Amino acid sequence: MEVFLEMLLTAVVALLFSFLLAKLVSVATVENDLSSDQPLKPEIGVGVTEDVRFGMKMDARVLESQRNFQVVDENVELVDRFLSEEADRVYEVDEAVTGNAKICGDREAESSAAASSENYVIAEEVILVRGQDEQSDSAEAESISSVSPENVVAEEIKSQGQEEVTELGRSGCVENEESGGDVLVAESEEVRVEKSSNMVEESDAEAENEEKTELTIEEDDDWEGIERSELEKAFAAAVNLLEESGKAEEIGAEAKMELFGLHKIATEGSCREAQPMAVMISARAKWNAWQKLGNMSQEEAMEQYLALVSKEIPGLTKAGHTVGKMSEMETSVGLPPNSGSLEDPTNLVTTGVDESSKNGIP
């Protein structure tokens, strides 16, 4: 199933990539077509206007030419029947020619008048500029003539007096600033001392609180370590007994899977491995048993493991307790009699004699 999904995903990704590539290519071609069509439009317009202008010029030249009039005269001489009509036409053509001549003359007169007006304006501008230059020269000469040595001395005296006044004002401001700065410095030092004392007190209080919390946490950790060690010992003994006794085969399949999941949680924690393939049936069943427990704590998993073992094999846990007690007794007997205990030395001697008599030592 997963292989089929992967193949389907690759096919969909390939189709999407090809579609995007085709879309980009089509957009690029459309932009190129638009950019190639844009510069042709003004060229077409320019060509049309030039053709129109050229046609107008040709018409005007034909009307102003003299060869046409000569040809008309010859035609009039050859044809006698239409003398009146041809004469009328010649008269009209003459009027048109004279009208065009008048129009040309008017245009030349207007252009000459415009040129003369422009020249007049330029001349006026030149005159105005010259007048402004003369006025500026006269003003400079008057200012130079008005500057006398007496006026210069008076201006220097005034400037010196103003400089002295400004220096006195600055010195007064500096003195005021220095006096005010001393006061501000003293006040700021007092504020800093107060803040530093408050900060020291707060830091001391925080350090004391942290020490208290650390002590309480260490005490809790010590107690938790003792409890966990006992639970872990019982769990390890049950697991070893279950493996050595060979009674795991007597347990049902569901209970066996549940024991496997609890053992995984107690030893490795919550399940973080990937799901195995559907072909691996046993591995998938074990993974499901492990995943089903979720985020169960290791202590809870150990307790449930012991409870399930005692339920499925009742005598196994009792044997485990007896074995644990025997190991504890062996460790207690192996200790020396004066290993830091606060018992009476006479009792220690009597206990040693009793133990030697039991073991058959004279």
Swiss-Prot record:
Pfam families: ACBP. Transmembrane segments: none annotated. Expressed in roots, stems, leaves, flowers and siliques. GO terms for molecular function: fatty-acyl-CoA binding. SUPFAM superfamilies: Acyl-CoA binding protein. It is found in: Secreted, Extracellular space. It comes from the Eukaryota. Its main location: secreted. PANTHER family: ACYL-COA-BINDING DOMAIN-CONTAINING PROTEIN 3, ACYL-COA-BINDING PROTEIN, ACBP. This is Acyl-CoA-binding domain-containing protein 3.
